[in-house]
Amino acid sequence: HSGDPSIYGAIGEQMRRLDRFEIPYEVVPGVPAFAAAAAALKTELTIPDVSQSVILTRTAMKSSAMPAGEELENLSKTGATLAIHLSIRNIKAVVADLTPAYGEDCPVAVVYRVTWPDERVLRSTLLEIAGEVRAAKLTRTALILVGRALDPLTGSESRLYSAEHVHLFRHQKSG
């Protein structure tokens, strides 16, 4: 569900058991769902002057509780792009927790079964997304991305490519 064994998997406990019995194993990295979703959306998750951070998180449902301070309400105060795993059935609570900080017009993308042949993408706003998820009957295997960086018209150009930006391959013009 996350694309990589190190994110929201049980790999830690599995490796501890294998280690205890001295069973050799290899950890093979995967493509994280948030990165695959960004590719499917053809978008950047970090944009200068908009968001320079991506937070990977989830909501507490039937699984373990969230550690103190890691609730969506707290994370939303950062303004970072959020990649919310394992929470599509909790979409109404996600919207309620994020709307005060991000606003009803904040872009949201829900990517169902990213990289699979039946992949589906919903692009919307915090105001509309819960209804669209319900109408699409998405109940599992969907990643929720939230943040101003998801708006393709938002943000400024990277200073890296500015003619005024001096770096190793672009020296300061004399005179």
Name these PLM-found stretches.
Residues 1-61:
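Short glycine-cluster motifs
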Residues 5, 10, 15-16, 51-53, ...:
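A contiguous loop/helix-start segment that scaffolds small-molecule binding in enzyme catalytic cores
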